[in-house]
């Protein structure tokens, strides 16, 4: 569909002369492996670089995100959990799997998060310069209520859209955002601490 060659062979001689895994690693702003099987997690955690994906990841200097997806029993296996802990210690970001109906027919933890939620991880990492890093920001959004007496209150018709947009952009620019929100019909902003007040 893209017109680009899909690179799977580490040393494909029918392609341009480049050490592909190194050149791909240099081009990347971030890397996300989704879904990440127990096998690929184990290889990376233990420094095994025997295919195009693992050699590229080993050569990366950018942020690497791993999204485990597998059967619940495999995910909960102590060896897999130890490999995930090792990846975190090495600085990889491991995205927690969702719970739900799995491809094997079981129900439980190990489901890959939705593509939309994985996209937010990439956007958070690459969308904007992090010129608001180390800034703590509190944003208010939506309607509020001020009681007049035990029965009546004063409120407004705020939709919260502007406050949510500000919180989203500040998060993408690296700020640590707390969003104090009244009741709104706006989707929650990922990676933002939301405090509901109504």
Give a label for each model feature.
Residues 1-64, 71-160, 164-198:
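A cross-family phosphate/adenosyl-ligand binding-site feature
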């Amino acid at each position: 569909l893209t017109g680009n060659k899909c690179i799977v062979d580490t040393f494909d001689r029918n392609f341009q002369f480049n050490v592909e895994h190194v050149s791909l690693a240099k081009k990347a702003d971030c890397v996300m492996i989704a879904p990440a099987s127990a096998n690929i997690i184990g290889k990376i955690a233990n420094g095994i670089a025997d295919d195009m994906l693992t050699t590229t990841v080993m050569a990366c200097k950018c942020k690497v995100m791993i999204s485990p997806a597998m059967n619940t029993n495999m995910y909960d296996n102590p060896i897999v959990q130890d490999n995930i802990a090792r990846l975190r210690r090495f600085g990889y970001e491991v995205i927690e799997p969702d719970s739900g109906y799995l491809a094997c027919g079981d129900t439980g933890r190990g489901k890959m998060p939705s593509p939309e939620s994985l996209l937010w991880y990439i956007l958070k990492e690459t969308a904007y310069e992090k010129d608001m890093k180390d800034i703590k920001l509190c944003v208010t959004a939506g309607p509020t209520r001020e009681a007049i007496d035990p029965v009546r209150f004063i409120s407004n018709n705020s939709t919260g859209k502007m406050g949510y947009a500000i919180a989203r952009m500040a998060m993408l620019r690296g700020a640590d955002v707390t969003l104090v929100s009244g009741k709104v019909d706006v989707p929650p902003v990922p990676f933002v601490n939301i405090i509901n007040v109504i």
